[in-house]
Amino acid sequence: MAAIGRGRSLKNLRVRGRNDSGEENVPLDLTREPSDNLREILQNVARLQGVSNMRKLGHLNNFTKLLCDIGHSEEKLGFHYEDIIICLRLALLNEAKEVRAAGLRALRYLIQDSSILQKVLKLKVDYLIARCIDIQQSNEVERTQALRLVRKMITVNASLFPSSVTNSLIAVGNDGLQERDRMVRACIAIICELALQNPEVVALRGGLNTILKNVIDCQLSRINEALITTILHLLNHPKTRQYVRADVELERILAPYTDFHYRHSPDTAEGQLKEDREARFLASKMGIIATFRSWAGIINLCKPGNSGIQSLIGVLCIPNMEIRRGLLEVLYDIFRLPLPVVTEEFIEALLSVDPGRFQDSWRLSDGFVAAEAKTILPHRARSRPDLMDNYLALILSAFIRNGLLEGLVEVITNSDDHISVRATILLGELLHMANTILPHSHSHHLHCLPTLMNMAASFDIPKEKRLRASAALNCLKRFHEMKKRGPKPYSLHLDHIIQKAIATHQKRDQYLRVQKDIFILKDTEEALLINLRDSQVLQHKENLEWNWNLIGTILKWPNVNLRNYKDEQLHRFVRRLLYFYKPSSKLYANLDLDFAKAKQLTVVGCQFTEFLLESEEDGQGYLEDLVKDIVQWLNASSGMKPERSLQNNGLLTTLSQHYFLFIGTLSCHPHGVKMLEKCSVFQCLLNLCSLKNQDHLLKLTVSSLDYSRDGLARVILSKILTAATDACRLYATKHLRVLLRANVEFFNNWGIELLVTQLHDKNKTISSEALDILDEACEDKANLHALIQMKPALSHLGDKGLLLLLRFLSIPKGFSYLNERGYVAKQLEKWHREYNSKYVDLIEEQLNEALTTYRKPVDGDNYVRRSNQRLQRPHVYLPIHLYGQLVHHKTGCHLLEVQNIITELCRNVRTPDLDKWEEIKKLKASLWALGNIGSSNWGLNLLQEENVIPDILKLAKQCEVLSIRGTCVYVLGLIAKTKQGCDILKCHNWDAVRHSRKHLWPVVPDDVEQLCNELSSIPSTLSLNSESTSSRHNSESESVPSSMFILEDDRFGSSSTSTFFLDINEDTEPTFYDRSGPIKDKNSFPFFASSKLVKNRILNSLTLPNKKHRSSSDPKGGKLSSESKTSNRRIRTLTEPSVDFNHSDDFTPISTVQKTLQLETSFMGNKHIEDTGSTPSIGENDLKFTKNFGTENHRENTSRERLVVESSTSSHMKIRSQSFNTDTTTSGISSMSSSPSRETVGVDATTMDTDCGSMSTVVSTKTIKTSHYLTPQSNHLSLSKSNSVSLVPPGSSHTLPRRAQSLKAPSIATIKSLADCNFSYTSSRDAFGYATLKRLQQQRMHPSLSHSEALASPAKDVLFTDTITMKANSFESRLTPSRFMKALSYASLDKEDLLSPINQNTLQRSSSVRSMVSSATYGGSDDYIGLALPVDINDIFQVKDIPYFQTKNIPPHDDRGARAFAHDAGGLPSGTGGLVKNSFHLLRQQMSLTEIMNSIHSDASLFLESTEDTGLQEHTDDNCLYCVCIEILGFQPSNQLSAICSHSDFQDIPYSDWCEQTIHNPLEVVPSKFSGISGCSDGVSQEGSASSTKSTELLLGVKTIPDDTPMCRILLRKEVLRLVINLSSSVSTKCHETGLLTIKEKYPQTFDDICLYSEVSHLLSHCTFRLPCRRFIQELFQDVQFLQMHEEAEAVLATPPKQPIVDTSAES
């Protein structure tokens, strides 16, 4: 009703407005023949004189009435549509804006289909529509109607949309704000609408630039989002992506942040610059955030190369505080994090983002406890995927990959305090988020914070920076403590509920616990008396001065109560407290809620009631006194008028509301319940339920009582749920969610029943809330069983009710219940037919609500609501899917198999049709269905049989419709819900999160399935020296060394490999993939259960059959044996389990050596080792490092060795290896560490040099992970003309004590050095060989990438980048030894360095000793959260380059124009296209009027005769308002002279007749301050034009040339067109305008020329003019009569009515 009433009132207003404007009431007789009515209307509209404008207005309004009455039919109307349009368009030329508005309205009603629209456009009415939009003279009514007509044209057929109107809209969009045009937003909205329907015409005219410009102009998030989403929609699909310039247009929104000199408008005054900059920041922030909320935006801003995300993060490293502050706000918004207050105090900032901080919505008058609990208590879903997590994980991974963490460290250490504080909190939030939602391959390097640790520990950097870093680490520790503590309830009511729920569970668990207070000290009584005295209660009556801490202690004292202690002092103590708390005393009750000790006083009050309860009979009298007083207060409150009771009792503002907590405390105890019954408290509360306007009292009642026991408390709750007001019923329903989340005892027995009752509430909001709570409750199987037992009716609740019912199918009991009723078969059919598609809408709507300003329409309202209010970290839990529920058990799986559903879904995925949106939606529906099926092990087997998972992975990486990639990411997350799913994805280089939500601090499970005895293989770290070890936080007490061994195996395909040491000389062409994390294999690397076995086998192998000496000058290095060249072997690494070397001085190896074991070592150095068969022993000293380590330079004494051990493992593994891995974020120099994540070094087998350590030194801060797959034929790299180097495993253990490294701007990659002092090491030449190997790998990965692109990881400290020159054949070191040493000296000793994963196969998911959890002890039955990402996140950001679209595709009615303006031109705004450019080119070639008139007589004649010139270069019959009608009507108008369109009209008029001039007397030039007739100097306005700088008048001697001659008109036309085209340039605009005004003044009849106006309109439709210029041009022609067009209309109406013929061509 409201909507109807509103519509009627608006209509009345509209009518009244027209009457106010003077419209004459023209009667319309609908009983007459429609053709007669129409003829009368058209005659009145077309008549030039004799009909007042207001009468015309009446007739035009009658025209719309007539159309609405009889419909669209040429037969009924008696006129062709062309005839009607020829007459109606005259209304658009009327001088009265009301008539023009009515004409536009009439056209809008007339255009019903494409055929009519084609006719309107053929008659060039679009020129006149554009004219209405351009002109602004208090004519908003007219312009509004014009825009409504434009929208109708888009709706009818956007592909026909004319460029003339597009240019007009774009001009308003570009310049409207400066011109204070009120239609600017409407025009931009229409441009967006058009861009979606016909992107080509918008892109061709530069409309996309207009949209993006307005993004930076608009600070309203709803509008800003709509604008940017238009561009993102075009980027989403390959067919429309061509219209957006790659890497240029979308990146415009970043400009305010990335361009420090950005000025949005050159006209901004200096004084307004700061304000303008703030506005641009805000608008840009909104645009960036909206872009990151869409898949098209994410993929385009994150794609590898020079991406937008790199620009943003790079700017963080530049010390501009204003930009940093703004960017931090952007990042907080992108990750949906609350923004801390601006402060220099970290604690203050931290408290401002504490989830438990007070919020206004938690007040009693608002959402109270229900709102607080929804924020603080976690959702019951433990493993149901939250799609927001998937989205955030992807974004976070992309940002981390591009160096965000290092950027934040730079901001923390180099910014003002308030910025540093914000950056620290953001860093903490992101690390916490990464720990929770990132797969381990994406997060293993996050927790080290090496750069920050380095800065805090190093004395080589400025003190201020070091102190900042140290402070930041302390702050992060406090932040972690806050996260670990979790959100604490703010209100005592919620705290009371949670504590009671915990207490009941604990009591149940510890029912038979032994009393702890058996051994009470003898002096308890004495101590009690001392405390009584010190509490001050007995000393004085200043209640608030009492020691309330001591009072609480006394009341909680074990075994102290009035029953045990008869002491009078204790009774006095109790009486004083009782008096204080009684409502009648008005002491406690009248204190304000925000009083400093308010919470403490209430807590003590609750303890006091418990104390009295425990005192039994002795305390009963006091307790009864208190309770009766509270009842009296309650009755008094409820008896008053509501406003008085609240005002007088101060329920909203005073502690009186906490009396309900006292009642709640009593309701938790059986004795307390009896007391409440005895004092009629329950009866009083029941009476409250039926009273009106007692909402606050009822809220307090519901929130305070304990419902764990069956009794009157539940009766009261039940009554409030059914009998109270709507607001109270809704609150009570919401409170059931609080009880559910607080895990109140036996909720499934009684809570579910109450919720089912609420489903039938007449208020839809309440039933919907109950349904939502039931959905959450069913996450718990006990609740689901209880619900199925009740068999509720859910069909009346729409789609949500249906989805809840589908949950029944997930357990056999529910399946059989529904199957018996034939429900399952019906649903299968429905889902196949329509619900699979509906499911896509449901999910995308939820995601839109969570991510954008979109709000779901309420109660069937079609109006799309938007909200500027920012949602706090919303959740989008995956809706229930029929197939996903069926696959939870074997019966359901069998049913899906029998129905052949999966095969069809797989077919849709394998052969998608991406050209139609319906097909794209069908593909999404199939993906979601398959994902839900794959979310259980049963269903996953079905997907495996179809082998469809690789197809989904392919779509995720390569699909050209970018939103499909997003859907695939979500769907692959569903497949990763089970361990089996994770393992399958792992084989395809996708890593998944392997924990559920109940693990708040997830520990990485051990993936090593083959590990027989996990505990025995937990390695530990080698102690470097006492100083470094003691400085390590939480270091292991017992440190033992470990060793790394290379395992070679001639049997291909027998086990997984991790090849670090590669023979570079072998011929092979492995395939490389850039990875952001180690690649995980299905089966991990085999450890040996017994460390003794390993020790023996390794020691048995220490013979040296193939030693090869190499001097430091040997250019080729130690060549490997010919055997190693010819045989294809697989090299694997193994981390030896911990072996304690400290118990013996040395090892004595067993002398027998197995034949299959080889040791291949190449030595370099000046120490000679005999090439004998003896096996050197490894002594303890060989592995110990002295404290003077690093003082001598023995770089030549390095050695390389290869220990070769045979190992047999499982035979079904893929062959994978890691050739080069620099992917620790830590500075990787570590002690000889061996951890689950660590490959350790090859043992140095020399016995002579006791200071020799291991040769493994690779340092890096961020990751370039490279893995390659070995083919069975070969496993070595080929590298011509290169050293044969046995390479070191990057990041493996090290031997240097280190200081922290101070980094330069983190955006610059710095080397961490490969040199060290007196332990065996790679030479610098080896380092270059190593680097070259890396470069070649990168080139094979991305042949098209430049050196910097290929090598520069987003890391800030990448190994081997700019500091080493990367040239294939000429290695030049830019590092001096001293710089090597300096770099090494900085390295940090962060604990996590030792725990950073290296080995891809075995140790992917490992962290540290504390992370070692066997999969056996891990919660196996619990599903994971359902989140997976590719190991290399860039895999899903690759987009095929589509060239920018060509401008040759012009709408059909512009063919002639397209031919005319075919070339190129300069100086135009982008987006105008070739048409625009060439018109300049041609028009500049014309001779100016001055040149023609200055030429001699014969030249002028020749010029005119040779060109057959009309003065109009682009004129055709099709693009002229006048000539097109002649062509259509097929007759000539009466006034031939009016149209000088063809040369024949004046061809026979001799030149001398009007220019009586001899050859010897040329035209005289009369100087004036203007040049030419126009008064415009072409020398100034157009570079290169050949015009006179003098002024001319058309004179013969002193006689003016007659201006009514054809020749004169030609010249004037040329001059007008030349000046008009010059106006499209912003140079000398004023000069050109002056020239046109001069012509207007001297030759006004020049502009009364329809063909000239059509030509000008044609130029306006094909060239870009600024809005002021368009307005100026339109106003030149504004007072023109256009008589010939009236004559055409009269000719139409003069012809007798003829039978209309349907135009079939137009229809086609």
Curated annotation (Swiss-Prot):
Residues 1-789 are annotated as: Interaction with NBN. Residues 1022-1041, 1103-1134, 1204-1252, 1275-1298 are annotated as: Disordered. Residues 521-570 are annotated as: Ribosome-binding domain. This is Rapamycin-insensitive companion of mTOR. The modification Phosphoserine is found at residues 21, 35, 265, 1138, 1162, 1219, 1235, 1274, 1278, 1282, 1284, 1302, 1313, 1346, 1353, 1385, 1388, 1396, 1411, 1571, 1574, 1577, 1591. The lineage of its organism: Eukaryota, Metazoa, Chordata, Craniata, Vertebrata. Its main location: membrane. There is a cross-link at K274 (Glycyl lysine isopeptide (Lys-Gly) (interchain with G-Cter in ubiquitin)). The keyword Acetylation applies. The modification N6-acetyllysine is found at K1092, K1095, K1116, K1119, K1125. InterPro entries: ARM-type_fold, Pianissimo_fam, Pianissimo_N, Rictor_IV, RICTOR_M, RICTOR_phospho, RICTOR_V. The modification Phosphotyrosine is found at Y1386. One of its GO terms (cellular component) is lysosome. The modification Phosphothreonine is found at T1103, T1135, T1271, T1295, T1332, T1376, T1695. Residues 1206-1221 have a biased composition (Polar residues). Component of the mechanistic target of rapamycin complex 2 (mTORC2), which transduces signals from growth factors to pathways involved in proliferation, cytoskeletal organization, lipogenesis and anabolic output. In response to growth factors, mTORC2 phosphorylates and activates AGC protein kinase family members, including AKT (AKT1, AKT2 and AKT3), PKC (PRKCA, PRKCB and PRKCE) and SGK1. In contrast to mTORC1, mTORC2 is nutrient-insensitive. Within the mTORC2 complex, RICTOR probably acts as a molecular adapter. RICTOR is responsible for the FKBP12-rapamycin-insensitivity of mTORC2. It is found in: Cell membrane; Endoplasmic reticulum membrane; Lysosome membrane. Component of the mechanistic target of rapamycin complex 2 (mTORC2), consisting in two heterotretramers composed of MTOR, MLST8, RICTOR and MAPKAP1/SIN1. The mTORC2 core complex associates with PRR5/PROTOR1 and/or PRR5L/PROTOR2. Contrary to mTORC1, mTORC2 does not bind to and is not sensitive to FKBP12-rapamycin. Binds directly to MTOR and PRR5 within the TORC2 complex; interaction with MTOR is enhanced by deubiquitination of RICTOR by USP9X. Interaction with MAPKAP1 is not enhanced by RICTOR deubiquitination by USP9X. Interacts with CCDC28B. Interacts with NBN. Interacts with SIK3. GO terms for biological process: actin cytoskeleton organization; cellular response to nutrient levels; cytoskeleton organization; embryo development ending in birth or egg hatching; lipid biosynthetic process; negative regulation of apoptotic process; positive regulation of actin filament polymerization; positive regulation of cell growth. The keyword Repeat does not apply. Residues 1222-1240, 1275-1288 have a biased composition (Low complexity). Zn(2+) binds at H1515, C1520, C1523, C1651.
